[in-house]
Amino acid sequence: MNEIVVKGARVHNLKNITVRIPKNRLVVITGVSGSGKSSLAMDTIYAEGQRRYLESLSTYARQFLGNLKKPDVDEIEGLSPAIAIDQKTVSHNPRSTVGTVTEIYDYLRVLYARIGKAHCPECGRPLEKKSIDEILQDLFNSFKEGSRIYILAPVATEKKGTFKKEIEEFISKGFARIEIDGEIYRLEEVPELDKNKRHTVKLVVDRLILETRNEHRILDSLELAMREGKGFVEIRNVDTGESKIFSENLMCPVCGIGFPEITPKLFSFNSPYGACPNCHGLGFTFEVDPSLVIDEEKSVLEGAIIPYRWDRRLSRWVAREIEKRGVSPHLPFKDLPEDVKEFILYGDDRFEGVVPKVQRWHRETESPEMKEWLEKNFIVQRTCSVCGGRRLNREALSVKINGLNIHEFTELSISEELEFLKNLNLTEREREIVGELLKEIEKRLEFLVDVGLEYLTLSRSATTLSGGESQRIRLATQIGSGLTGVIYVLDEPTIGLHPRDTERLIKTLKKLRDLGNTVIVVEHDEEVIRNADHIIDIGPGGGTNGGRVVFQGTVDELLKNPDSSLTGEYLSGKRKITVNKTRRLPYASLKIKGVRHNNLKNIDVEIPLGVFVCVTGVSGSGKSSLVMETLYPALMNLLHKTKLPAGEFDSIEGHENIDKMIAIDQSPIGRTPRSNPATYTKVFDEIRSLFAMTPAAKARGYNKSRFSFNLKGGRCEACQGQGYVKIEMLFLPDVYVECDVCKGKRYNRETLEITYKGKNISDILDMTVDEALEFFKNIPSIKRTLQVLHDVGLGYVKLGQPATTLSGGEAQRIKLASELRKRDTGRTLYILDEPTVGLHFEDVRKLVEVLHRLVDRGNTVIVIEHNLDVIKNADHIIDLGPEGGKEGGYIVATGTPEEIAKNPHSYTGRFLKNVL
């Protein structure tokens, strides 16, 4: 069968649709936000492919995997095993790096174990172990036959002592001579040694001529010398004075440091064998920051010790202790004597100070909430003082290939690593050992280059990757695995990609297809849509207005019949996102000087205020480093007196021209299903107040807290207002089952009896934003927030949709709506990180209107963006580059979109030309 046929799909908002998908083709599913693209691709095709694959496993294997629910679909024909590559699975494990996620690091560990050269961790001397036979071979290769040689056993190197005991032992064993500090003595004639001076002592095991006929004697003497020299032997050519030291163990002849056996495990920072003993392979340690636990202005009794504020007994106890030292506990902390401050912070033998106490709480608590509270308020991550952030122990870091240890290698960018491997000088034997291994590493690195990630390093922590980067890493890993006959489902792989890199990504997707796979991509990017073999357009609107197939066929068919869908109208040029031709002029500017965070090259950036600013540049050029990691925390610390860690810079000028700062990124709006769009935007407070004002609620004496699913009283106690019950499966992932008592409605029966216009509180949470907007159109306080949610393109989202099920783009737009509903000051600076993620052309148009509205009120909007429709609407562009990683971090161009389009050095300008 050469196609996948989906019949009667009804998952979420899909309207019983039937779709035919050609196999072994690149298929793009597109449509406005919330139209049902992911419902078809992820929740129907992928979910059923996965479920059928798991059903084919044995009952024994299935018990560990749990039961996957069958999607609501009549049937799917021609399905193969499916692999999903989505945006949500950015790793939160601090041990994961780009190297471990792509499995390249596993290959590197083998490479270093096989051909790495060990060095002494103390003195850096190369270490090598050789068998007796190899030493013999080496002697004949290094010295001329007929040379006079001494075979010596090193006894001590630069050590104090008289060595009387050793000398007596050597006499009893029948040895004749010994070398002390370069002089050879007969053992019976050794002078008295000064025990306070350092001596180098070597036992002379044999003196002979290097000849083939002496081979057996040499072998015996070498063995004897190894035994006496504890694994070391020195051969000296008496004629030339040249010496060679050999060892049968990896051990330093000077420092006497033994070296563990070199295995791949030695290079794993997740194994106690290779990890740094201090940070256990994390590269950082959690430490209590003394400045965060103390409020200097207050006295101990007024609550100067912040972690003790929730238990005043602790503060009173500290007050008594300092009174014993003759100091008043009513003095502000800053006025206390230094020794008392030290005592409060670090304690003594009897008294546990605040810092060790908080450190102990963090170490011993089993409550994730407590741990999170401590980390958020009092604890900072510090680079490990032992390994310097390198994660490995010193032995692992002393093994080198061409002068680089494994950490130094992973610190290179991927393009530099490829260069390094291609220029490796290896012997014939080494090539034989690692030839295939090198090919595999190079192949996997090339796949990362193909998906536009050549600027990353393998040591980069996976937790710092954006959703788009982590998705493309997993895409590269899949190509590396070389599977065929599989259905790949990708969710917006172009996130975070500059138009320049999209072309390479499309080639990669086609490579995946040409291996014999069906590649289904949920995508809004014009280039990807134009390169598809087959297009499925879902719509026409979002939420209840979506869920239908408005078009399926090839690009050419869509362009011939553009009126069939919104996508067709935009692709054919019938509809366009207009350009705001009159560029606004700034009322002032903000200057940040000497920025050198990550790859930024000590740049000075001027940001005009009161206008719409776009920060652009290829992936890895330094956009997030500049805006999210330096400018945002630095301004927050100045304006709102926070203590956020900011990237390195020299100074900021002009911040007095703004009075409020709001950053909106793609992090989740909450980590638990209790958080949802209604609670996050605070519209739920208004709705609960409205329900409390109904006659029935007043008659029963219900206030607004009765309608909260987080508080006792109105909620269903069986599931504590969650609507489902979590069943812990011990070593399996937790399973969530609908609550038997409230049937998923979250509230008890009495609360659900209160209705407003025929709907109870649970029905309201089940409405989409657009449905609620119509329902509450006469209540201004509620309508205002819902209108903003609608304006940012979230009309299809349910008010009670758990935060855990929202995509990064949706979470960001909910945050944007939450800020837009507040009254701005007209001097607010808004920062947005790729707000167009997950948006169709039509949604981008709405978003641009919202951003213009903000700027028209006098505010400043800074957007990090790759979408040309947004960039062309900016008043001012700051283009970073020219490349990603080490080749980036410079300002390539600044100015209006028209000025950038004329700049020959700007990649962004080249693409802007075509849309202005």
Curated annotation (Swiss-Prot):
Xref: InterPro entries: AAA+_ATPase (IPR003593), ABC_transporter-like_ATP-bd (IPR003439), ABC_transporter-like_CS (IPR017871), ATP_grasp_subdomain_1 (IPR013815), P-loop_NTPase (IPR027417), UvrA (IPR004602), UvrA_DNA-bd (IPR041552), UvrA_inter (IPR041102)
Zn-finger region bounds: C4-type: 252-279, 716-742
Principal location listed in the UniProt entry: cytoplasm
GO CC annotation, single: excinuclease repair complex
Domain ABC transporter, residue spans: 308-566, 586-913
Any one of the GO BP annotations: SOS response
SMART domains registered for this protein in UniProt: AAA
Any Pfam family the entry gives: UvrA_DNA-bind
Gene3D superfamilies: ABC transporter ATPase domain-like (1.10.8.280), ABC transporter ATPase like domain (1.20.1580.10), ATP-grasp fold, A domain (3.30.1490.20), P-loop containing nucleotide triphosphate hydrolases (3.40.50.300)
One GO MF term: excinuclease ABC activity
Database matches in PROSITE patterns: ABC_TRANSPORTER_1, ABC_TRANSPORTER_2
UniProt record similarity statement: Belongs to the ABC transporter superfamily. UvrA family.
Function: The UvrABC repair system catalyzes the recognition and processing of DNA lesions. UvrA is an ATPase and a DNA-binding protein. A damage recognition complex composed of 2 UvrA and 2 UvrB subunits scans DNA for abnormalities. When the presence of a lesion has been verified by UvrB, the UvrA molecules dissociate.
Protein name: UvrABC system protein A
Primary gene name: uvrA
